[in-house]
Amino acid sequence: MPSEIITLQLGQCGNQIGFEFWKRLCLEHGISPDGVLEDFATDGQDRKDVFFYQADDNHYIPRAVLIDLEPRVINNIMTSPYSKLYNQENVFLSKHGGGAGNNWASGFSQGEKVQEEVFDILDREADGSDSLEGFVLCHSIAGGTGSGMGSYVLERLSERFPKKLIQTYSVFPNQDEISDVVVQPYNSILTLKRLTKCADSVVVLDNTALNRIATERLHIQTPTFTQINNLVSTIMSLSTTTLRYPSYMNNNLIGLTASLIPTPQLHFLMTGYTPLMSDCETKTSVRKTTVLDVMRRLLQPKNMMVSALTDKQSRQCFVSILNIIQGEVDPSQVHKSLQRIRERKLANFIPWGPASIQVALPRSSPYVQSAHKVSGLMMANHTGISSLFKRALAQYDKLRKRNAFLDNFRRESMFQDDLTELDIARDTVDCLVQEYEAATQIDYPQWSPAVEASKAG
């Protein structure tokens, strides 16, 4: 029985990466931009109905809800060649169209005001599913709509559908650039609190690392949003391959997350992908790829889509790893590669659990040609991700100490009387950092926030 997934795209960034994701899915399943199955798409071994449903005339419609408080990005989607793909009733645009002004508080309170309309769409979409498994939410944590309204929707979703899984693809800001959003540290910490409390799994898409990969690995001097979003859509489509081309394991969202997330709070995942190749690279630069080569490269920090401390010199370690390997793969090669990785101690694992690298070998789309014999995506739970949260906390503390740029927050009802919500959010993220650090120790199974607090006291 297919387990359907509803995708929510929130804000400018969420809708842009969502758009690239659907373009990619259409390509992989042989669906034309207007939702009609291509004549050549006769394979029939894929599960389109996890992410699409069929209209009365049999054309495919994404199980997607597009939400924004300003119209530009959604208008671009609706005037693109893919405009007929979407269900127009699943598009929510704020009537005043003024956006959230990159302010989390504004996005959150606007979410509250329009919740009825938004959840009418979501309820209708959920009721139309035979066996809904969960929701995927695409957004950014730094702006106003994706972070603020995204946080509001996340809270309500987890209350309204407590038995359904919520996975997010969350874009973290580029730390190498000076942001034009001065309140970005506040937005990030407030959103991280909701991602910690309300999501079951968060795939971290770190703009710092994505830009670094585009420049260093793909040799693109100044990467455009489209090029970065292409990278993101590759990660999103590969991370859902086992759901769309099912095999005997990891063929639903719960199976996928259960192997990666052993304890509820440690649910922030990083990804790595290899081999990377840009559009401008020629066929001559294609090298030989083997299973061992791909699995070894996936463990290298430079192929990680997160700029966190993952090197073996640090105390940080892997909690779990799932490698999704595609192409010409002999299962015996997988076994040999795992043995080699273990012998050479190429991956440093937690001391309190099994050192397991799981490997999934889903089929590739027969409609998309790859230049490489073998390619792989790693989804990893790694304690080094806490360095990303520490960076966010340091930037937050710098602003909060001076109470800088808080006027726009105080205009919203949540912050009118006091700023407690900001401090609670900071404590939540700080506790998350402590838990990831505790996970590097052998006594982690006995760890609890209360014990940690009493030590500090």
Curated annotation (Swiss-Prot):
* MF annotations from Gene Ontology: GTP binding; microtubule nucleator activity
User: In which tissues has expression of this protein been reported?
Assistant: Expressed in nurse cells and oocytes of developing egg chambers.
**Which GO CC annotations does the UniProt entry carry?**
centrosome; cytoplasm; gamma-tubulin ring complex; meiotic spindle; microtubule; nucleus; spindle
Q: Which domain of life is it from?
A: Eukaryota
User: What name does UniProt use for this protein?
Assistant: Tubulin gamma-2 chain
Query: Oligomeric state and partners?
Result: Interacts with Ote.
Q: Which PROSITE patterns match?
A: TUBULIN
Cell cycle listed as a keyword:
yes
Report whether Cell division shows up as a keyword of the record: yes
